[in-house]
Every structure is written in C-alpha cells, then in structure tokens.
C-alpha cells in the first residue's frame, strides 16, 4: 500500500467585507505549490531539466513586462477578483463564471494570473489555452460581489472591473459548456485507467469548512460502494489527509475486495489524475466536482447534501447523469 505526504490546506484570513466575504473572518491560509520536474527538448534536440516553479517565476515576470508600454489593458474588460485562500477548484468556478458573463455582454475577459501560487500554477498548466492576463497579473478594482452561495445571475450592467465570489454552480456557464471544456482541456486526462474508482474524501481541520460544508460520512461511502461497477478493482484515494482517508475505507467491509492506492499529486496534477479514473466518488469539494465534470467518467457518485444550511444546495445536479446519494 502506498502512502502520501499529508499537506493541510489551511483556511482563510480575516477580511472585513459584506456579501460572500462576510463569513470568511479569522481564517488563516496556507497556499502550496508542488514541484514537478520534467524533460523538455531544445531546438538542438538536447534534453534540459525544467521545473514548474521555474515556469511560474518566468510567467510572473512576463505579466509585469507585458504591461509596460502597452495600451491593450485600456480596452473594456472584466476579470475574476480572487479571494485569499481560494484553491484550484474555487478558482476554476470563478473563471468559468466570469468567462461566461464576458461572452454574454461582449467584453474581454482577463485573469489575474499572478495572484497566487495556485493561479500561477494553473496558468502554466493551461499553456496556450490560458486567457490574457490583467495588468501585472493582479486583481482589478472590485465591481461586483456575489451575494450568497446560491446561484444568482450576474447583472448585465456589470461590464468592467473585478467580479468577486465562488460562483459554485454550473448555471453560471450554462450554454457555453463546450467553451469551458476547451479552455480547461489541458487539465483533463485523455485516457481512463481501467478498473479504477477515484474516491475523494475531505478530512479537514478548518473550522469554517466544518460549519459550512457537510463532510463525507461513512454511511455515504458505504452506499457509494454498493453502486460501483463490477469490474472495479482498485480504489485510488484523493484526500487532504490520504492516510486517514485510506484507513477509514480499509476498515469498511464494503471495500474489502479492492486494492488501495493513495494519490500523492497536488493541484493541477491531482485534478488531471482524478479525470483519468474510470469512475468517481466525489465529496463536497469544488476540485472533485471539476474532476467529474471535466473527466466525464463512466459513473459519478455525489453527496446530495453539500452545505450544512438546508437552503443552500450543491452545485447543479439538475439534468445530470450523476448518482446523488
């Protein structure tokens, strides 16, 4: 059995705002970046070593240099206004919502790619698919703030500046799904790994998440096991605390017939690996939601209760083939 290094995702720092930011006070954050070395080939055919951190550092400099002496940033445009503590899944929802709004009102969409390690890693992973950067890759002036976690259409009068929120609903980009899939295509695995099910389990140590989101229960996982296809042989565990998550599953009789493996990837690489699973059991997690939506696995099993508050529903399951328990 393989184990993985445990990295706690942390929580969010104090911010004094209304709307969607009002509940995010007194919450510390730790951003992380996973190093990944790979070979690249120069024009002479020689291999040279390159790291993701190096790419990100160069991209950050490019954001600053590209803004000098250029008038392109004066054109009317909107952009995501990222919030401290946002992780990859949150950022993808925000980008998708703002891209969709920009198309509805016919203005450009630019992204503050230099905002954090997570956004810089995402920019590097998207490559040529990445949208144009904001000035110096930073957040722009706040123009709109999401009122709550419920789906609320963005007013068409919002035609410039930064749009702040989590926008965790597929309704925000309904009608342009092919465009969003193309934009995020580099994050998606081409092939599936036969006989695998990816199970995402959030253990958590964040008091805000404990009060806001329902964590996966043993009962949910037991019900999910009963829905897996007969040809599934291996469980790949994706978690903020993979050792604890795997220990939970191993003790359940429903999973006794499977072999187990803990995924050790982070960020974009973890998302890419999740999309290669033949089937997925997702948690109350934006990242695993995107893995299911982008990866289109044969079967997706998702929790019905996403938030602790009954009035707030999970990101759109309507007209979905997902199995909701």
Where are these regions (language model features)?
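Membrane-proximal basic amphipathic "stem/tether" segments
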Residues: 1-74, 129
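Secretory-pathway luminal glycosyltransferase catalytic domains
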Residues: 45, 54-55, 59-78, 114-232
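A structural signal for short, well-ordered beta-strand segments and their strand-loop junctions
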Residues: 77-79, 108-114, 198-200, 236-238, ...
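A short, glycine/small-residue-rich beta-strand->loop->alpha-helix junction that serves as a flexible
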Residues: 83-93, 209-210
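Donor-binding and catalytic core of enzymes assembling or modifying cell-surface/extracellular glycoconjugates
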Residues: 88, 228-303, 308-309
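Histidine-anchored nucleotide/phosphate-binding helix
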Residues: 93-102
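Short, aromatic/basic amphipathic alpha-helical patches
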Residues: 119-131, 244-255, 312-317
């Amino acid at each position: 059995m393989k184990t993985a290094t445990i990295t706690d995702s942390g929580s969010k720092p104090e911010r004094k705002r209304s709307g969607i930011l009002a509940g995010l006070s007194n919450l510390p954050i730790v951003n992380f970046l996973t190093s990944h070395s790979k070979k690249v080939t120069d024009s002479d055919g020689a291999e040279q070593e390159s790291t993701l951190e190096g790419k990100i550092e160069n991209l950050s400099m490019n954001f600053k240099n590209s803004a000098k002496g250029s008038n392109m940033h004066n054109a009317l445009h909107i952009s995501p206004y990222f919030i401290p503590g946002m992780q990859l899944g949150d950022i993808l929802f925000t980008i998708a919502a703002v891209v969709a709004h920009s198309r509805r009102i016919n203005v450009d969409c630019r992204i503050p790619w230099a905002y954090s390690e997570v956004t810089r890693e995402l920019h590097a992973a998207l490559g040529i698919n990445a949208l144009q950067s904001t000035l110096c890759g930073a957040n722009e002036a706040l123009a709109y703030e999401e009122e709550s976690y419920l789906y609320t259409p963005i007013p068409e009068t919002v035609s410039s500046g930064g749009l702040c929120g989590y926008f965790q609903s597929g309704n925000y980009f309904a009608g342009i799904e092919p465009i969003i899939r193309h934009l995020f295509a580099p994050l998606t695995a081409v092939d599936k790994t036969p006989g695998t099910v990816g199970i995402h389990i959030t253990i958590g140590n964040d008091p805000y998440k404990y009060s806001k989101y329902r964590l996966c229960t043993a009962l949910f996982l037991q019900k999910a096991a009963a829905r897996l296809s007969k040809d599934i042989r291996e469980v790949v565990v994706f978690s903020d605390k993979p050792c604890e998550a795997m220990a939970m599953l191993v003790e359940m009789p429903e999973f006794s017939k499977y072999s187990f493996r803990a995924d050790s990837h982070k960020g974009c690489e973890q998302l890419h690996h999740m999309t290669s699973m033949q089937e997925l059991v997702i948690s109350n997690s934006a990242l695993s939601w995107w893995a299911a939506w982008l990866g289109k696995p044969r079967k997706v099993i998702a929790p019905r209760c996403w938030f602790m508050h009954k009035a707030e529903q999970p990101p759109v399951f309507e007209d979905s083939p997902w199995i909701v328990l």
